[in-house]
């Protein structure tokens, strides 16, 4: 575990899925203008970089971009990170009939929504640690649908 305040580096590879046939989850994050929204993005990026999930673009889902819609509908488990109670990520997915396997509303971790302020990197590191712990203790399940048997890349 990282002990430096604000250190967003994930723990070593022990957090990556352990079952080789389990599909890598897709993670979508809020990217609004508040401090809470901006905190969600680096958490999603760290999940991507450590291999716990593959980040994709929620704006592309909202914009009906075909390639990104194909990824969202691939049948892989989805992690939604919403910065505030407006739950824009969850709502954008729901507009397309997509339910995340795991939804994290960052206010549940004490993240406050503040306009015109930067997020606290130490708080982002704590949120990352809690999300990784949750994913470790309650792994996501899911498999690609029959129509989409091969793994799609989530990068947008």
Spans of features found by a protein language model:
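A general structural motif
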Residues: 58-62
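Iron-sulfur (Fe-S) cluster-binding modules
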Residues: 1-57, 67, 72-77, 87-156
